Amino acid sequence: MTYTIFKSIKLLNPATNLNEISDVVIHKNKIFSISKDFQTEVLKQNNQIDIYDCDGLTMTPGIIDMRVNIGKTENLVSTQKIAAENGITSMVILPNQTPKLNNPSIIDHIKRQSENTKLPKVNVYGAATKDDQGLEMSEIGLMSEMGAIGFTNGNKSIKNSLVMRRLMSYAAMINRPIIQHAEDEDLSGLNLSLIHI
């Protein structure tokens, strides 16, 4: 039987306030034991043991990245692979990609493309407003039916208060959040420390 031992690895789990250095033993792809000083002699008879010195390394539950941008030179699979290499087990894609995630068929396509893989789970935010302009509400009901877990204009704020009010009212009916980028474009770029009131 094969056992893998991660010696002296820092364990972090915010859900249980765990923050300690321990030895973690893996057997049959599951955690077999966690202890401060695991005695490997117990396993040495008739077992293959792979031991890794993990001093300075950290083990956590899977990390969820809630704001993923897919770059122009990347695609969904390459983004998932990069995420997996960095401990991300689930991710949410922002809508201002190419193509924009602004209609039900694109949301459905992304969800289907990411199913049945061993790569990180993919969720998507649908575009809150058409063309990220903040002027007209997108088809958030239909995008929700196709799997959008929330709605945002990504890295752009929704400036129009009436549009935002309509979005929040409709989103409440379909039990989906509206995520607002916290930036006032009319003020960004100004050196507010120079303005005296």
Regions found by a protein language model. Give the residues of each.
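N-terminal metal-binding scaffold of metallo-dependent hydrolase/deaminase domains
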Residues: 1-44
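Generic alpha-helical hydrophobic packing signal
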Residues: 8, 23, 49, 54-55, ...
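Active-site-proximal flexible loops/turns
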Residues: 15, 60, 72-74, 134, ...
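Short, glycine/acidic-enriched loop or turn micro-motifs at the edges of active sites
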Residues: 16, 68-70, 184
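Residue-level detector of flexible, active-site-proximal loop/helix-junction positions
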Residues: 38, 58, 129
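Divalent-metal coordination cores built from histidine and acidic residues
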Residues: 80-192
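Conserved small/polar residues in nucleotide/adenosyl-binding loops
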Residues: 195-197
